[in-house]
Amino acid sequence: MIRMNMQENAAQVHQFIEFHRGDIITFMREICAIPSMDSQIEAVGKRIGAEMQKLGFAEVRFDKMGNILGQIGNGPKVLVYDSHIDTVGIGDPQQWQWDPFEGKVENGCLYARGACDEKGSTPGMIYGLAAAAAKP
């Protein structure tokens, strides 16, 4: 019985993610397009907060350090995700094959400053939590 519920839940999450695939990619491209070097994270933080609100997070706020805190759902279990959204600089722009803030998609991969470290995990966390909180 538990195994079936897990399979059903996994199928529902997969369906939610497939439905929102374009939104997830757009969101990732948008946050990677916002420069956030040297801990200048306010603009990208506001964009992330807006996405959380759009997805139904009941509480979205910033603490005094600039961290984005959000709450979605009201079940008995609590999940905490953590990431950083600042990046290192781009160095010499002439050394890049493309605009590092463009969010270039090629062969199924997104290339942009911060895509791997660490802005890229943020859409998965936010949409994953929204999927888990979604009613079947």
Regions found by a protein language model. Give the residues of each.
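Acidic/His- and Gly-rich active-site-bordering loop/insert found
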Residues: I2-A115, A132-P136
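Acidic/histidine-rich catalytic neighborhood of metal-dependent amide-processing enzymes
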Residues: E118-P136
